[in-house]
């Protein structure tokens, strides 16, 4: 019996669509799912395709060409550990496991270390693009041993999305680097979504625009600098109606939820001493929004501004919102890529940030016109420390910061919560400041804890007896 070229474990929507993507690209695919009825249903719904179902792990593994390539599209954590343990008795030296879940990068490092003891390679690969991306072409971020990647790269390039004819996949680096990049990708996604939500809220509350009008504004924005997947879907979300002819957006509970990757990103930023302020505020906002019962109580007890906003030039104000959103987006990406650079140095990953920005240009959730500018800046100079310091982005920042400042000021004056936008201008002002009040903080630390300080006029470390 002929053996299959690749195997996929996990037939939820991502695994199923990835298997169909592989099959469409002329690969024979073995599939396995813990719930057997799901496997049977997939075969029933996809007749005459090179999908081969198996109902035991042993039969599944033995159905594959050696060295085997097995893709895991399952829930991260215990489920991944259990699945790998079930595979081990039937694997051979040189086999490759690709973990395509949203796995914590340190778990990937540990699993890769343990598997390498028995000669099995682990590739931790981030897959972005959602269920549609999995089917028609995701952005793929594989990390692990270079030789393992070289073996599986032909199939990854076949199934990946492409930008200007080049597949949106590249070798990220060793061990957990692929999952780390996917984690930061998701953090940037949090920031993007929060900035868009705040812009929508300003248009809705301050300008009192209806959903149709806001959708048209987002459609116009999507034709220019802000062109992106998230802006594109937002314009459609705003005008979607339910079966009662109500705008669906107005019927959705305002409690943000998450799966934890944003939290991982912010925790890593703290470990690296990276000021990931905008993305962190976006994570915190989801936590705050989930306090619905408390917010309802507070809305009856705590007072806010009573003034009624009157705009003199609506089109001019909308343009300022657009500029504020774009600069906020730039700052979010600047923080995310700065964190990638810090992680690369700490873990010796040698991340190629220009290549990473390139593979984000198609297939993934954060794909945006902006990424072409990022790639271009890295191709011109790969040694800069922050996107805001590069020619294109500093020109935008120096032009748009006044709009961001005005939108934040007006929103605060009228009681509109905008944590991401306000974080953006705060970061911008802090980053461009040659002097910050941290001198006082250092003096306070030395006063109560003898933590010492440095001076600007003398070299060395100093401590003062503040009580004398």
From Swiss-Prot:
InterPro entries listed in its UniProt record: 6-PGluconate_DH-like_C_sf (IPR008927), 6PGD_dom2 (IPR013328), 6PGDH_C (IPR006114), 6PGDH_Gnd/GntZ (IPR006113), 6PGDH_NADP-bd (IPR006115), 6PGdom_BS (IPR006184), NAD(P)-bd_dom_sf (IPR036291), Pgluconate_DH (IPR006183)
Active site positions: 182, 189
Residue positions binding NADP(+): 10-15, 33-35, 74-76, 102
One biological process term in Gene Ontology: pentose-phosphate shunt
Pathway(s) annotated for this protein in UniProt: Carbohydrate degradation; pentose phosphate pathway; D-ribulose 5-phosphate from D-glucose 6-phosphate (oxidative stage): step 3/3
GO molecular function, one term: NADP binding
Keyword NADP belongs to the record: yes
Role this protein plays: Catalyzes the oxidative decarboxylation of 6-phosphogluconate to ribulose 5-phosphate and CO(2), with concomitant reduction of NADP to NADPH.
UniProt family annotation: Belongs to the 6-phosphogluconate dehydrogenase family.
Protein name: 6-phosphogluconate dehydrogenase, decarboxylating
Upper lineage: Bacteria, Pseudomonadati, Pseudomonadota, Gammaproteobacteria, Enterobacterales
């Amino acid at each position: 019996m002929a053996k299959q070229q690749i195997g996929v474990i996990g037939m939820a929507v991502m695994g199923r669509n990835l298997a169909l993507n592989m099959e469409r690209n002329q690969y024979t695919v073995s599939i396995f799912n813990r719930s057997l009825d799901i496997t049977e249903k997939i075969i029933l719904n996809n007749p005459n395709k090179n999908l081969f179902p198996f109902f035991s792990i042993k039969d599944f593994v033995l159905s594959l060409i050696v060295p085997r390539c097995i893709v895991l599209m399952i829930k991260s954590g215990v489920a991944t550990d259990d699945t790998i343990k079930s595979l081990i008795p039937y694997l051979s030296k040189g086999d490759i496991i690709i973990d395509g879940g949203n796995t914590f990068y340190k778990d990937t490092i540990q699993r890769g270390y343990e598997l390498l003891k028995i000669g099995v390679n682990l590739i931790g690969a981030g897959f972005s693009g959602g269920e549609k991306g999995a089917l028609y072409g995701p952005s793929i971020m594989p990390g692990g041993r270079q030789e393992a990647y070289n073996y599986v790269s032909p199939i990854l390039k076949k199934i990946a999305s492409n930008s200007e004819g080049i597949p949106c996949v590249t070798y990220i680096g060793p061990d957990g680097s692929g999952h780390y990049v996917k984690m930061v990708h998701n953090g940037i996604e949090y920031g993007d979504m929060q900035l868009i939500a705040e812009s929508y809220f300003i248009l809705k509350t301050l300008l009192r625009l209806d959903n149709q009008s806001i959708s048209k504004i987002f459609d116009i924005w999507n034709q220019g600098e802000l062109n992106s997947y998230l802006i594109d879907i937002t314009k459609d979300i705003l005008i979607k109606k339910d079966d009662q002819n109500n705008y669906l957006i107005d019927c959705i509970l305002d409690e943000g939820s998450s799966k934890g990757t944003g939290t991982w990103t912010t925790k890593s930023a703290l470990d690296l001493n990276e000021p990931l302020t905008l993305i962190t505020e976006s994570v915190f906002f989801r936590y705050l929004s989930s306090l619905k019962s408390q917010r309802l109580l507070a809305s009856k007890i705590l007072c806010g501004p009573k003034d009624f906003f009157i705009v003199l030039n609506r089109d001019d104000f909308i343009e300022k919102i657009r500029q504020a959103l774009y600069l906020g987006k730039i700052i979010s990406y600047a923080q995310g890529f700065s964190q990638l650079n810090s992680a690369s140095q700490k873990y010796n990953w040698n991340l190629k940030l220009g290549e990473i920005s390139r593979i984000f240009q198609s297939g993934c959730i954060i794909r945006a016109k902006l990424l072409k500018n990022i790639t271009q800046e890295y191709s011109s100079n790969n040694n800069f420390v922050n996107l805001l310091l590069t020619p294109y982005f500093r020109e935008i920042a120096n032009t748009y910061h006044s709009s961001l400042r005005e939108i934040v000021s007006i929103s605060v004056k009228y009681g509109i919560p905008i944590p991401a936008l306000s974080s953006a201008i705060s970061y911008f002002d802090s980053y461009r400041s040659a002097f910050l009040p941290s001198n006082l903080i250092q003096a306070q630390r030395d006063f109560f804890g003898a933590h010492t300080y440095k001076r600007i006029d003398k070299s060395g470390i100093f401590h003062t007896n503040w009580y004398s």
